[in-house]
Amino acid sequence: MPLFGSKKETAKKSSKKDKDEGKMPAVEDKYILKDLLGTGAFSQVRLAEVKEDPSRVVAIKIIDKKALKGKEDSLENEIRVLRRLQHPNIVQLMETYEDREHVYLIIELVTGGELFDRIVEKGSYTEKDASDLIRQVLEAVDYMHDQGVVHRDLKPENLLYYSPDEDSKIMISDFGLSKMEDSGIMATACGTPGYVAPEVLAQKPYGKAVDVWSIGVIAYILLCGYPPFYDENDANLFAQILKGEFEFDSPYWDEISESAKDFIRQLMCVDVEKRYTCKQALGHPWISGNAASTENIHSSVSEQLKKNFAKSRWRQAYHATAVIRQMRLFATKQVIVRRKLSESQ
C-alpha cells in the first residue's frame, strides 16, 4: 500500500495512460527540482517550480525509504494529520508522490524565516507585537485541537513567517510528532525538553493541554528573550519544569505588563485542570483586549535572544535524540519513585 494514501486515492491521481502502463505519476512530471533548502536525518527539502507555471514555487520534502525503514508509521501519521488540517496559519500539504526509493511531500513554501531571527532584525518590537504573534498561534492550535490533533512539539523553530513582508502572518510547521487524539492514549515522553509540559515528563497520560503549556513557554521567551527553564544539567531542568518553577526576573520583566505575566501563568500552570485551553487563552485581555503594552522592548529582548538562542547550546542540544532519551529515563524514574511512595503509605 502506498505510504501516503489508499489505493483508491492513488488511482484518482493517475491518468488513464498511467493506469494502462501500470505506474503512478512521478513527481518529475509536474515539478522541476531546484535548490536544496535543508536536510534532516531521513529527508531533504528542495525548492521546486511547477512545470506548467514556473512562477509558482513549492517546497518538496524528499524522504528516503531505506533510511525511514521501521518508522513508516510516523510518516503515515504526519501525512494523515496534514491532510486533515486546512488553516491559514498552518503550512499546507498540497499533494504526495511515491516511487521505489522515495516519498515526496509537496508543501506550501514559506519564505519569511524563523520567528526569533525576524524579531532580532526588527527596529521596533512591543508586547503588542508578541500578543499578535501568540494570538495567531493560538487560533491555529485551537483549530487543530477542534480537529482532534495535538502537535506535541510546538517551539520557536517550528514557527515560520509566511513571507518577508513586514505584516506577514506566522505559520506552524513540522507535524512529525503530532498525534490524533482518537488514535489512542498519549503517554510517550516526546517533544523538545525546554518546551515540554510537566505531565509529559511525569509520564502521565496527556492531551491538548501540552500544546498550551508550550505556547506559554514561547510567550515567555517572546517577552524577555530567554527561556523560563534552563539548567546545564538536564535532570535539574526537568525538575524545574515538573514544579513549574519560573520567575519574572528584574530588570528584564520590569516594563512588562501584569496582564502579560498573568497570561503566562495561566498557560504555564502545572495543574492541567486549571491550565487554560486555547479558547480561554484567546479570551484573555492580553490577547483579545488592549492590555498589551506598546512600549518598545526590542533592545532588551533582541539582546537576550542573540545571547541565548543564536548558535547556543539551547538550540543545538534540544534537537538531539540523546536528550529525548534522557527525558524518557527521567520520566521512568519519576514513575518508580511515585510507586514506591504509594507502597510505603
From Swiss-Prot:
Residues 1-23 are annotated as: Disordered. Residues 307-328 are annotated as: Calmodulin-binding. Activated by Ca(2+)/calmodulin. Binding of calmodulin results in conformational change that relieves intrasteric autoinhibition. Keywords: Allosteric enzyme, ATP-binding, Calmodulin-binding, Kinase, Nucleotide-binding, Serine/threonine-protein kinase, Transferase. GO terms for biological process: molting cycle process. Residues 31-287 form the Protein kinase domain. The keyword ATP-binding applies. CDD domains: STKc_CaMKI (cd14083). PROSITE patterns: PROTEIN_KINASE_ATP (PS00107), PROTEIN_KINASE_DOM (PS50011), PROTEIN_KINASE_ST (PS00108). Highly expressed in hepatopancreas and to a lesser extent in gills. Low expression in hemocytes, testis, ovary, heart, eyestalk, muscle and epidermis. Residues 287-327 are annotated as: Autoinhibitory domain. The autoinhibitory domain overlaps with the calmodulin binding region and interacts in the inactive folded state with the catalytic domain as a pseudosubstrate. PANTHER family: SERINE/THREONINE-PROTEIN KINASE. Belongs to the protein kinase superfamily. CAMK Ser/Thr protein kinase family. CaMK subfamily. This is Calcium/calmodulin-dependent protein kinase type 1. It comes from Macrobrachium nipponense. The gene is CaMKI.
